[in-house]
């Protein structure tokens, strides 16, 4: 047949086609890149803003049977519960407007590739005023508490002691000495570093190491530092401070240390200028500044300090007028709830009054009533502290308590002036002052819903801040569930303790217990010193604070 000449052996055809007669379809598992799309989808996502208190049901659909995970980024305000069959209940409740971000992920299988979906739900806050008031009815199991009337040694508040360092030859503080300060009621120590030996030169490496050694001791001993630098204590000294350029060089030298010890520095007093670093008797910064040009050297120093100190920390100026004049501020420019703690220059400049109650104007601390009004408003959001300096009719107990409240005092020196302190003790207000400097959180009650493993539980905490001020540095708030199996589950409370001002406060949050039985704690920890119980806040209630863990027991489910 003519067609035979076109026939080719089968093996040759296979070879020409690049195949082998023994080839068979591959049964190997394809790579993730080759896997099919599982068509992961989420139903029930609202297209519009939802009101706080809304309960949503989310249903996840997918062709794959890979493991599913659903999570929210704000568990304090969005409780998530698995209902089974790929259904989830989401309950949202927030005092302010928020976006709740939800992520859904599914593992890859032999047939389908991994999948993920992310979406956001806008939640309208109920408003701070809509949080339960002190006498409002609250649902759930109620737990009440008894106030601990003793003064409590809490971090970053209270009475302070002082320690001076005059040269690099001095032995730094020992940890034992620091711990002994705590036992006498001091969680704050004013470290006064005198730079007399360096008034015309750079700081020595040895002196800088001495500074660091003192701060190391404070950290290990559980105390924080109020830091001040100065050049002399002598009002008759020929040179009361260094040249402006020298001071700025010293600040630059100190910057690495200030950055390194952010965790243990409570606040930095502006210092450097004048006798004791109090910005008054000065040789090089203008004794009585009036014009913007007069204030220029002090502003140069303040700007340098703002740059040298971590943004989380504040700098105290000796009078409100310094802040107003250097930064062209009027009474209307005081810090508000919106601008507080936003990292701006204005939000980071605080004050210290080292002649508290000495006379009508506290020995020049206040130029006029505007200056007083400025500090009254500003200190709601910035650190205020200092010491007394002379007995007068302005430091009688009733006026003293009013001023401490009005100016939101956080700390006070209990070593000076002894006449004033003795008067407060004999007149019966010293103990009250010791108790209420800074914050003092007293639980009123807690209400919680039924506790079931794996199910979000709503908890309402009502408390009073009986202190003169709110906490001022960043602080975390955690709900800590310790299950009956001993395991710990932590969830952020969702509130900033710096907003817990004097008076009544309340919070509403969620936690998801891992077991049906266990204990719920509130931990108010220092974010830069995690796990340090001595730097955690103790609530002023009996039988609540655990000194070993730094936790405050809210309730136990047995």
What kind of feature is each model-predicted range?
Residues 15-18:
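C-terminal motif of bacterial Sec signal peptides marking the signal peptidase cleavage site
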Residues 64-68, 72-80:
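Short, solvent-exposed loop/linker segments at beta-strand-coil boundaries, enriched for Pro/Gly
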Residues 129-187, 192:
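Boundary/entry segment of secreted carbohydrate-active catalytic domains
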Residues 174-232, 244-246:
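Aromatic-lined substrate-binding rim segments of carbohydrate-active enzymes
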Residues 207-220, 241-267, 294-308:
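An active-site-proximal structural segment forming one wall of the substrate-binding cleft
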Residues 226-236, 254-291:
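Active-site groove signature of glycoside hydrolases
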Residues 267-269, 278, 282-417:
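Catalytic-core regions of glycoside hydrolase
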Residues 435-558:
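Extracellular/luminal regions of secreted and cell-surface proteins that mediate adhesion/ECM remodeling
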């Amino acid at each position: 047949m003519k067609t035979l000449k076109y026939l080719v052996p089968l093996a040759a055809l296979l070879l020409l086609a690049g195949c082998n007669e023994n080839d068979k379809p591959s049964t190997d598992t394809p790579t993730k890149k080759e896997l099919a799309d599982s068509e992961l989808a989420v139903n029930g996502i609202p297209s519009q803003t939802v009101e706080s208190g809304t309960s949503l049901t989310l249903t996840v659909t997918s062709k794959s049977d890979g493991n599913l995970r659903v999570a929210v980024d704000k568990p304090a305000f969005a409780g998530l519960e698995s209902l089974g069959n790929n259904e989830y209940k989401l309950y949202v409740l927030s005092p302010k407007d928020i976006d709740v971000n939800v992520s859904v992920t599914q593992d890859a299988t032999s047939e389908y590739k991994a999948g993920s979906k992310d979406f956001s739900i806008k939640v309208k806050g109920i408003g701070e005023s809509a949080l339960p008031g002190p006498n409002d009815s609250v649902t759930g199991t109620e737990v009440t508490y008894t106030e601990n009337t003793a003064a409590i040694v809490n971090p970053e508040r209270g009475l302070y002691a002082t320690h001076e360092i005059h040269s690099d030859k001095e032995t730094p503080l020992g940890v034992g000495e620091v711990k002994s300060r705590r036992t006498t009621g001091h969680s704050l120590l004013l470290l006064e570093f005198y730079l007399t030996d360096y008034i015309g030169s750079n700081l020595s490496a040895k002196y800088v190491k001495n500074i660091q050694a003192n701060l190391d001791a404070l950290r290990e001993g559980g105390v924080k530092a109020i830091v001040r630098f100065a050049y002399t204590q002598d009002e008759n000294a020929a040179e009361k401070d260094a040249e402006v350029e020298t001071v700025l060089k010293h600040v630059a030298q100190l910057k690495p240390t200030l950055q390194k010890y952010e965790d243990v520095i409570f606040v930095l007093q502006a210092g450097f200028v004048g006798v004791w670093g109090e910005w008054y008797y000065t040789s090089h910064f203008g004794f009585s500044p009036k014009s913007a040009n007069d204030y220029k050297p002090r502003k140069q120093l303040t700007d340098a300090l703002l740059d040298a100190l971590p943004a989380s920390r504040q700098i105290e100026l000796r009078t409100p007028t310094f802040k107003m004049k250097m930064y062209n501020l009027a009474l209307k420019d005081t810090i508000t709830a919106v601008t507080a703690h936003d990292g701006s220059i204005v939000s980071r400049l605080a004050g210290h009054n080292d002649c508290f109650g000495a006379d009508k104007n506290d020995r020049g601390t206040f130029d006029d009533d505007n200056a007083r009004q400025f500090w009254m408003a500003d200190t709601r959001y910035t650190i205020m502290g200092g010491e007394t300096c002379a007995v007068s009719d302005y430091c009688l107990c009733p006026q003293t308590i009013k001023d401490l409240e009005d100016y939101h005092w956080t700390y006070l020196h209990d070593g000076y002036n002894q006449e004033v302190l003795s008067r407060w003790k004999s007149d019966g207000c010293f103990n009250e002052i010791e108790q209420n400097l800074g914050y003092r959180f007293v639980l009123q009650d807690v209400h919680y819903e039924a506790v079931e493993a794996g199910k979000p539980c709503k908890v309402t905490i009502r408390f009073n801040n009986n202190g003169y001020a709110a906490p001022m540095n960043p602080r975390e708030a955690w709900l800590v569930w310790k299950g009956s199996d001993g395991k710990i589950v932590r969830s952020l409370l969702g509130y900033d303790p710096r907003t817990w001002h004097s008076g009544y406060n309340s919070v509403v949050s969620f936690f998801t217990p891992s077991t049906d039985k266990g204990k719920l704690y509130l931990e108010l920890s220092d974010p830069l010193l995690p796990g340090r119980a001595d730097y955690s806040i103790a609530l002023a209630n009996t039988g609540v604070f655990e000194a070993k863990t730094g936790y405050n027991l809210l309730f136990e489910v047995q």
